[in-house]
Amino acid sequence: MYFQILVLMSEGYGRSLFSEKHFPHDRQLLPPFTTTMSLGSFFSFPASSAFFDRKKDDGVIDNPNVELVNRNLWSTFLECGTEMIITKKGRRMFPLVKLKLSGLDKNSNYTIIMEMISVDKLRYKFWNGNWIVAGVGEHHPLPTCFVHPQSPRSGEWWMTDGVDFKMAKLSNNPFNNDGHIVLNSMHRYNPRFHIVRADSSGQPILASLKTFSFKETEFIAVTAYQNDVVTKCKIDNNPFAKGFRNIDTVRKRKMNQIISTPPASEDEEPEVKRTKSEIEAVMFSDPKVPQMSLQLISQWQEALLSTIVQIPITNQKSSSERKSGFGVVDLLGSS
């Protein structure tokens, strides 16, 4: 028989970990408090096992330690206030969380978990270049953890290859079934990382649980970037955003080509890119009727009328007109 155990973690958090440049009143707004958060993952344990008692251990001696590999990159974002996009389908984090592990027992298996913790109970908004408090934060009872898909693995494997959470996605959809981390927009979070040793059957040994966190990884969840500085920082550092880096240069080059390249003829003008409003105006404007000469219109009217009332049509063209071509009557024939 198996039971589902929900591990509850409690930890106190103080004031902001963001730069005071973007949270100038942080000292007064965020007094220390203690909160209880769910680890966000249920583990199945045999009813007869000793895992219910956190004091019991398997006798393995280890000293887990975690280092944030890309600390400098995270620090760069911290200076301008890191923002992470959340979507209903889920969005990957950037910067990625990359960890280096040490002090693990080489022959024991370990499970690595990333959990998102609310830094405070407040909701924020970006105003006048700074994040300010907009009110009381929303209640967040949903799981906010991501178990690394390679878990459990041996301590030797973790220490050799390290850990990254590139597969973790952030979402604002509480009904998603894809295992995404569900967060509230305009709330502040900081991930913490749990290392727990597993037995031969893959079940975690709770007594071995160790937790780590880094001040540099704090961020605000948003549905769209609020700070232009953050947007530029992500474009400059994200290898998948290199297509956006030279967009201004490309635009300037195209404008210079239009200005410097003369038209092919006096009647030809350089093509000007239309705006969205101009395109919509053309799409929804009244259709234009092509202009026809009065002579051609009268020929059509006379020809159509003759087919209805069967009035003979006399073709009274001069010899000069016949040489120049034929009219509508010639196409329809005469009676």
Curated annotation (Swiss-Prot):
InterPro entries: p53-like_TF_DNA-bd_sf, T-box_DNA-bd, T-box_sf, TF_T-box, TF_T-box_CS. SUPFAM superfamilies: p53-like transcription factors. Residues 73-246 bind DNA. It is found in: Nucleus. One of its GO terms (cellular component) is chromatin. GO terms for molecular function: DNA-binding transcription factor activity, RNA polymerase II-specific; RNA polymerase II cis-regulatory region sequence-specific DNA binding. SMART domains: TBOX. GO terms for biological process: cell fate specification; positive regulation of DNA-templated transcription; regulation of transcription by RNA polymerase II. It comes from the Eukaryota. Its main location: nucleus. Keywords: DNA-binding, Nucleus, Transcription, Transcription regulation. PANTHER family: T-BOX PROTEIN-RELATED, T-BOX TRANSCRIPTION FACTOR TBX6L. This is Putative T-box protein 7.
